[in-house]
């Protein structure tokens, strides 16, 4: 936890209250006795993952939002197949929407034949028309219940870059964890695994008490589920408690209004608040959406930087050189409210200072966005004059990120419509796009009403059938579960 302002003579009790507040906000306890190593980019992640898989003797849990059918994906599949053949229990979980079309039908057959298990999270279901909105965006690996990885990287060659085509590696961050907190990472995997099918047997689960301490670092594993918003609450607490600096990195930055206000308030109080985001996103529409929110941050004193490389995919925060966060959660409504996400909050000066060093290095390859005071326009000021922003797309966004982008578009348009201030150029473009889309929809609906009415009728019938089916299943389950002598509510006639 960042340094707390203590007005009384009982700092220990204040610290206890702070720990309680963070535990309640995150829905996760603070676990001590861990060793944490910061990993940068695929060049450090992928070799570490392969080494861990090769060293496994009992179990491997492998979870990723995206697993590409490319050289990187095949290398990990083959490594898992080899361990499964040797008797190691291997379980792989990937998101159905994050990886459609990326995995051929036969991609996982060798692993299944070797005795491994593979599950796709949340494929479409007839009785849940909107269920696809909740995705498993987590990226984690647990080996033998004693070694864990939590990161922002997916399994794809895009993170390695392509020197022949002039594409730099994607910038990303994760951590390697040894110690009792690994049990919480395993528990997070087991939670989503049980949603996708039968649960992991209790006999195969690892208890934190059975893991020997590996260091002195305290870790909080924040396993967010739809509507839980644990990380959102934690980040707001950190913004309120930070005293000197709060440095954020985010890949798809369209934050909700309460968090924007928390950052603005911290900056007004003199906290050095910085936000580092991609200059060029793998989702083309996202950059103007992110930029539409810069002005309110800049006017409050928040410093905003855009990464000049191919793609910045990291999701990190570091406060006061004492507290750090690393994981899969982006600062937008899709990640904070609708997805299954996994992050670790780390209370350790060594780890926090290492992330601050990484942040300072990243700013050497970034462009600062500033306000031109004369007309209050947003402009770019190079931080590293030897480098110009690289505006190119490394690869097309996945279907899952495209769906999340639609949610972000709605949020950004709402902000632009409701803010009582002059619109920036980026915001004006968003409104033009929204207006053009609505106008086109209106013309089509007026000229060819059947083009709109028929799909609407089909969707309405689908929703109605799905709701009736779920209601029937719920009623049937309730009847089966009702024991003899169960309590029933009756209206009392007494005054």
Predicted region positions:
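Contiguous, function-dense segments enriched for cysteine-driven chemistry
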Residues: 321, 436, 440-443, 479-484
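Charged, low-complexity intrinsically disordered terminal segments
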Residues: 1-439, 493-495
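Hydrophobic alpha-helical transmembrane segments of polytopic
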Residues: 431-434, 455-462
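Structural motif marking the loop-to-transmembrane transition
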Residues: 391, 395, 448-452, 472
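Membrane-interfacial hairpin junctions
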Residues: 441-458
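Membrane-cytosol interface motif
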Residues: 484-494
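Membrane-helix interfacial anchor on the cytosolic side
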Residues: 462-482
